[in-house]
């Protein structure tokens, strides 16, 4: 069965929000780290999100794929750019990473508007 990455991301958002109320220290600290690490600097947020997508493929994290495809699209990434990031994930992840490239393609097609 094909994963609904839009729904997966929404479910994770809800669960992470709950954790934010139950363990606010670690969750707030992580949120701050994420915000600072992903803001524009020498590298744009878009580039950083695509780097995170490639890493998500390597470590085999479907939830991470959902988050980083969504956020890369939000930052202006195009399908060709996202697919190049997927290729880097394949390079670095080898055989096991190849399975997650298919997951990434599904997520790209679900988050990216038609024709982009």
What are these regions (language model features)?
Residues 83-109:
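C-terminal structural segments of small proteins and small subunits
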Residues 42-59, 80-85:
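Immediate flanking context of iron-sulfur cluster ligation sites
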